[in-house]
Amino acid sequence: MAPGRRVERVAALIRKETSELLMHGIRDDRVHQGLISITQVDVSGDLQHCKIFVSVLADPEGRAQVMEGLQAASSFLRGELGRRLQMRRAPEVVFHLDRGLEKGASVLGLLGDLERERQERGEIPPGSDDAQNCHDDEPS
């Protein structure tokens, strides 16, 4: 098996097991103060380091507490991953906050605001598909 495929397979297994541990294995109350989604798992080629990117749905204070709880649980998580995946040496786990979903929601909110402003000015009729209207003038 190519080294890249093994790294991908280990990353997928780490994602699955970490998800299970977040739901049922970690007892730290800080971790359960928000909705956590694992967005990406990056494992180094030598399988010694693992970055787990998470999105946390909570207020800023709750998000900070969740991240503190995850960092505190990382050594427990490393041990559990080593045991569950039967790895001789489990990778060192570091959690990173992924703000991609947050930024996406912000962009969608801004686009919604822009559409409402355009409707108020009468530039586009309510409920119309602006993209479709742009192509109506083109010849077939």
From Swiss-Prot:
Pfam families: RBFA. Residues 116-140 are annotated as: Disordered. One of its GO terms (cellular component) is cytosol. PROSITE patterns: RBFA (PS01319). It comes from the Bacteria. Disulfide bonds: none annotated. Its main location: cytoplasm. The keyword Cytoplasm applies. GO terms for biological process: maturation of SSU-rRNA. Gene3D superfamilies: 3.30.300.20. One of its GO terms (molecular function) is ribosomal small subunit binding. InterPro entries: KH_dom-like_a/b (IPR015946), RbfA (IPR000238), RbfA_dom_sf (IPR023799), Ribosome-bd_factorA_CS (IPR020053). PANTHER family: RIBOSOME-BINDING FACTOR A, CHLOROPLASTIC-RELATED. This is Ribosome-binding factor A.
